[in-house]
């Protein structure tokens, strides 16, 4: 069962500044997957028709395989963000958007607060207004060719690597139109098997499976 926490109030009260973030000692690495409601690899005509009207929703997920924040061990935990904006999230990076941040309920209070503070501030522009921080069960597992993520009953994202037949794609004028939302190592284009948000906090729900709208990779910072 999901539990709303006092993390949102805590983060607002702390009013963390960029200088404070810079003095935080941290080291995190692990697996990452994201998907948005716009195809990242598609023909130019389709991309042009989608660019203004969609791409306003996204899910981002991190699995921390090794990590510490100011000496707090956060190894083994996952963090997921569900984002809904008023415009294409990539093309209009300063357009208003709202985010629900999910933090692994297996973490203790100190660990959850450290994760929420770090991810909220590192992704401040991408997240926009973080309207809720929720402690919930998070599953982030490897599949045969990608990752599968669940955050409580509200978020599901499964993506597999996109295998590109360049000759057939070139005939259709397909190309990559977007980059991942965050810096990655070994970034791979992906296809969503499932991509959905069914919560109520964002005043928007979506389901966008079977599209070339994902990125998979490794992160470290």
Predicted regions and their residues:
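Bacterial N-terminal signal peptides that target proteins for export
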Residues: 1-9
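Context-gated lysine
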Residues: 3-4, 66, 109, 167
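N-terminal Sec/ER secretory leader and immediately downstream segment
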Residues: 23-103
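Mature, soluble, non-transmembrane domains
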Residues: 102-219
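Bacterial N-terminal signal peptides
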Residues: 8-17
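Acidic/polar, glycine-anchored loop/turn motif associated with catalytic or activation segments
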Residues: 20
């Amino acid at each position: 069962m999901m539990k709303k926490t006092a993390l949102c109030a805590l983060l607002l009260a702390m009013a963390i500044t960029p200088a404070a973030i810079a003095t935080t000692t941290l080291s995190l690495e692990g697996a990452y997957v994201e998907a948005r409601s716009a195809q990242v690899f598609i023909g130019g005509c389709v991309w042009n028709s989608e660019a203004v009207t969609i791409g306003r929703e996204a899910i981002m997920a991190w699995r921390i395989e090794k990590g510490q924040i100011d000496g707090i061990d956060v190894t083994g935990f996952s963090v997921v963000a569900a984002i809904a904006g008023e415009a294409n999230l990539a093309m209009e990076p300063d357009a208003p958007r709202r985010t629900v941040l999910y933090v692994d309920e297996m973490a203790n209070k100190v660990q959850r607060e450290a994760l929420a503070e770090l991810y909220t501030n590192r992704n401040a522009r991408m997240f926009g207004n973080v309207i809720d921080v929720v402690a919930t069960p998070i599953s982030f597992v490897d599949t045969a060719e990608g990752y599968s993520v669940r955050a409580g009953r509200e978020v599901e994202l499964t993506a597999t690597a996109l295998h590109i037949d360049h000759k057939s794609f070139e005939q259709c004028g397909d190309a990559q139109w977007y980059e991942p939302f965050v810096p990655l190592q070994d970034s791979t284009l992906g296809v969503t098997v499932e991509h959905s948000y069914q919560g109520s906090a964002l005043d928007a729900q979506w389901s966008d499976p079977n599209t070339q709208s994902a990125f998979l990779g490794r992160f470290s910072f």
